Amino acid sequence: RAIVREAGVFLMDEPLSNLDAKLRVQMRAEISKLHQKLNTTMIYVTHDQTEAMTMATRIVIMKDGIVQQVGAPKTVYNQPANMFVAGFIGSPAMNFIRGTIDGDKFVTETLKLTIPEEKLAVLKTQGSLHKPIVMGIRPEDIHPDAQEENNISAKISVAELTGAEFMLYTTVGGHELVVRAGALNDYHAGENITIHFDMTKCHFFDAETEIAIR
C-alpha cells in the first residue's frame, strides 16, 4: 500500500518479520524486483543479516545506536571493520581465535599457523607483532583436507547435513570451530579429521579494541 504513493524514499521496518521461512524467501525476491522496477531508494530495517546481504546495494550495520560500518554487501563480508561486523554478517558466523604472532606464525597454546607474507607485513606496519590479537576465519575458508601447511587435527562434535553441504562443529586444540564442507563425503560426530586453514582469507583484529588490523 505504501508503494502506491510513489514516494522518493520508502522506509520499511522489518516488513517480513511475521512471515514463515518459505514466504520470507519469496517476499525478499518480490521486494528486490520492486526496487529494480521503481528505481527509488528503499531504507530497509532488519535484524536478519541474510535479508541485508541478499537485498541491499549498501548496508549500514549498527550496534547500540552506533554505526559500525557502511558498504556494499560483498565489501562488508570480505572486509569487516571490526569483530562485531565480522561475527554478525555471515552464517554460520566467522570463527574467532585469540593468540599472538611469533615470527611468521599465528600461535595459541595449541595451534601454530603460518601467516602469508602480505598479511604479516600489515601486522608489522600496524605494530601488532607483540600484542594479543584475534584471528578470524570463515567456515568456508577451513577445508576438511590436508595441504602442504596449516593443517590441524580436529574432532567433529556435530555434523549437520543441509543438503548440498555439511556444517561441521569441531574441536581444534581446545577451540570450537565451524567448518563448511561439501557433501561428497560423509561426516559423523566423534570422527577425527584433518582440516586446512586458508590463511590468505583470514582476518586479524586488535584483541582490545576489536577493530580490524589493516
Where are these regions (language model features)?
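ABC ATPase nucleotide-binding domains
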Residues: R1-F84
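Residue-level detector of alpha-helical recognition elements and their boundaries
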Residues: E30-I31, T46, V67, P80, ...
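Short, surface-exposed, charged/polar-biased interaction segments
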Residues: K37-T40, Y44, D48, M55, ...
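ABC transporter nucleotide-binding domain
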Residues: P73-G103
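Non-catalytic connector elements of ABC transporters
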Residues: P92-F96, D104-R214
